[in-house]
Amino acid sequence: EYLGDRYQSEFMRLAVSLLSLVLFFYLAGQLVSGVVMFEIMLGLNAEWALGITTLVLLFYVVLGGAHADILTDGFQGALMLVLAVLVIVLTLMGYGIDGGLFALVDNLEAQDPNLATALNPSTPLYHSWWSIFVIAFAHMPLGLLPHLGNKLWALDSTQDRFQFVKLAALFGLMLGMLGLGGLLARAYFGDALYAEGANPNQALPLLFIEIFPTWLAALIGIGVLSAVMSTADGLVVS
């Protein structure tokens, strides 16, 4: 509706509506992440985990609409930032590994030399600088993140929108560094996450369970779940 009114074009309105159907795949990915969190942290089976994730999401989105989405995303986003800072610090400290960060790098190199280099030819995600650029571009705020658009368009002034873009870029960079937690998880668990029946998506929750008391791991897990829910509700509203 915003783009159609902005450019006074029914074609633009219709085209964006049709393209928005692709968001169902993005939403499905977020729900799967929620399933993983509930499976690991609460021991639920996949069906119950998916049902709970979906019901909680729909409950506050249906009752509150875009307003509920914006308010809850503000709270969830704060939790995500705290979690991101925690993961970055833990990784840079090489937490729980004798020798700290340098021992962490040595550990990864001993498992596979490609894990300690900028490029990893054995994976399609990081086999070239071009693939890394594409991944970075896909995560640029307001580039390919439609769930942020409704927050931007809810602002009245151009100044507020510009401020939003700056903050989104900064926070987006910090949240992207959550991937550093994968390095620490690989040092702890090795190839176990790639064994038959295992799921690499469980890396962060398993890492928290390994290095923290149960109550603290559960609390941190809420931060991970916040990332899932804040993205999913934004996609539903979009």
State where each predicted segment sits.
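Loop-to-helix junctions at membrane interfaces in multi-pass transport proteins
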Residues: E1-G4, A78-A218
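Helix-loop-helix module between adjacent transmembrane segments
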Residues: E1-G64, V134-H139, L225-G234
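Membrane-interface helix-boundary signature
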Residues: S9-M12, A46, L50, T72, ...
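Hydrophobic residues within alpha-helical transmembrane segments
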Residues: L18, I52-L55, G74-A78, K166-L170
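Transmembrane alpha-helix boundary and packing residues in multipass membrane permease domains
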Residues: G29-V32, V36, V89, H147, ...
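Re-entrant/interfacial helical elements at transmembrane boundaries that shape
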Residues: V236-S238
